[in-house]
């Protein structure tokens, strides 16, 4: 019964519109798969959802770990996409394409790249609207970066997209360049594929074929459908004004910060890009990683303002369905795809367990 419950939840989940926005009432696109598809009951997200069911049993009993790590000596530096050289950009995009060709070692279908979307659509869905939103995604980026290195010879770090540089016209950002970016909007002359999106036909990721959209097995192209209210082809940048970011970073408590980062910075881009980006399997679109790296960077900036306090500040409810207050001993779960770890290990990006900066 629990698995069916999680399936139903995952199928219905969409990124929540910002309160008071034009999208608040019924603004999320519905799934309209046009490719051939079958239910996923044969084993795809069932694996991750069963993992959630089992893992939730020990969710609230932290390990009480006292493991400490010395500060890293030479932290890697994550950089903004535009600051990378052409060869560095190609190193990243080719590694992503490579990962989408490596058979999964976690489930019988798809690739390791698909595994990340399944992970996010399963366990990751329970980390939204909760304290674990930022630390869970922080470590997911590290695991993704490690996979790119180990399987595909990636030599850099996951870059971030600073959308404040593009807030006046997000859809025209160089991140969507077809030559050295992520490709642009979906083909407006094509048919709708998933999530109100159409196939991306330009850029390095035009050939990717993810296998899942939410809980439905549907091999499809990467789909996007830029929309700002009634205007197709646009993405609202109102929430990405530099002054808006500054206001969020001035929040004094972690509870306030994580809530506003998710609602006002995370969700609007998912709603504006649409397609794959609209669902909990948003990691189908490589844009997911540079978007979340920017969110992680903002958390890092907030922590650096008062490191003695904020490198240990973790409050709220640990996961979406948790009761009680979150603690640093709470576990970030990855269902065997990566090591389950206490939150404390990822609070400091230069704490030894992690070793990077921005």
Curated annotation (Swiss-Prot):
Catalytic reaction list: 2 L-dopa + O2 = 2 L-dopaquinone + 2 H2O; L-tyrosine + O2 = L-dopaquinone + H2O
Q: Where are the transmembrane segments?
A: 37-57
Where does this protein act, in terms of pathway?
Mycotoxin biosynthesis
Q: What does this protein need as cofactor?
A: Cu(2+)
How does this chain sit within the bilayer? Single-pass membrane protein
Residues annotated for Cu cation A binding in this entry: 128, 137
SUPFAM superfamilies documented for this protein: Di-copper centre-containing domain
| One cellular-component annotation, GO | membrane
Q: Show the PROSITE patterns listed in the entry.
A: TYROSINASE_1, TYROSINASE_2
Matches recorded under InterPro entries: Di-copper_centre_dom_sf, Tyrosinase/Hemocyanin, Tyrosinase_Cu-bd
Glycan attachment positions: 28, 91, 109, 172, 214, 321, 325
Q: What Enzyme Commission number(s) apply to this enzyme?
A: 1.14.18.1
* Swiss-Prot/TrEMBL keywords: Copper, Glycoprotein, Membrane, Metal-binding, Monooxygenase, Oxidoreductase, Transmembrane, Transmembrane helix
Sites binding Cu cation B sit at 266, 270, 292
Name any one GO molecular function: metal ion binding
Per the record, the coiled-coil ranges are: none
**What broad class describes the main subcellular location of this protein?**
membrane
Give the record's cofactor note, including how many are bound.
Binds 2 copper ions per subunit.
Q: Where in the cell is it found?
A: Membrane
Effects seen without this gene: Decreases the production of ustiloxin B.
Briefly state the protein's biological role.
Answer: Tyrosinase; part of the gene cluster that mediates the biosynthesis of the secondary metabolite ustiloxin B, an antimitotic tetrapeptide. First, ustA is processed by the subtilisin-like endoprotease Kex2 that is outside the ustiloxin B gene cluster, at the C-terminal side of Arg-Lys, after transfer to Golgi apparatus through the endoplasmic reticulum (ER). Cleavage by KEX2 generates 16 peptides YAIG-I to YAIG-XVI.
Q: What family classification does the UniProt entry report for this protein? A: Belongs to the tyrosinase family.
How is this protein named in the record? Answer: Tyrosinase ustQ
């Amino acid at each position: 019964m629990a698995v069916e419950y999680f399936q139903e939840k995952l199928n219905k989940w969409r990124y929540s519109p910002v309160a008071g926005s034009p999208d608040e009432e019924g603004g999320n696109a519905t799934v309209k798969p046009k490719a051939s598809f079958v239910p996923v009951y044969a084993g795809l997200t069932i694996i991750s959802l069963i993992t959630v069911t089992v893992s939730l049993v020990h969710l609230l009993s932290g390990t009480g770990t006292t493991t400490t790590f010395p500060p890293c000596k030479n932290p890697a530096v994550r950089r903004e996409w535009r600051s990378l050289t052409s060869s560095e950009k190609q190193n990243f995009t080719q590694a992503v394409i490579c990962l989408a060709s490596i058979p999964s070692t976690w489930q019988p279908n798809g690739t390791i790249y698909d595994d990340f979307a399944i992970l996010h659509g399963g366990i990751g869905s329970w980390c939204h609207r909760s304290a674990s939103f930022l630390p869970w995604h922080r470590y997911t980026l590290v695991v993704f970066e490690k996979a790119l290195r180990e399987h595909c010879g990636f030599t850099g770090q996951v870059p971030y997209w600073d959308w404040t540089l593009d807030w006046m016209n997000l859809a025209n950002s160089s991140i969507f360049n077809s030559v050295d970016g992520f490709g642009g909007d979906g083909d407006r002359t094509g048919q709708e594929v998933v999530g109100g999106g159409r196939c991306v036909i330009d850029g390095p990721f035009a050939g990717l074929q993810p296998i899942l959209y939410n809980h439905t097995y549907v091999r499809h192209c990467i789909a996007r459908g830029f929309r700002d209210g009634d205007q197709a082809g646009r993405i609202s940048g109102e929430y990405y004004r530099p002054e808006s970011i500054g206001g969020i970073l001035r929040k004094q408590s972690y509870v306030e910060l994580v809530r506003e980062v998710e609602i006002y910075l995370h969700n609007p881009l998912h709603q504006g890009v649409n397609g794959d980006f609209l669902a909990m399997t948003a990691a189908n679109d490589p844009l997911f990683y540079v978007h979340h790296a920017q969110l992680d960077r903002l958390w890092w900036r907030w922590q650096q303002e008062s490191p003695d306090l904020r490198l240990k500040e973790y409050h709220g409810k640990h996961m979406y369905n948790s009761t009680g207050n979150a603690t640093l001993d709470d576990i970030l779960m990855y269902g065997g795809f990566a090591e389950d770890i206490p939150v404390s290990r990822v609070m400091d990006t230069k704490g030894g367990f992690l070793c990077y900066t921005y």
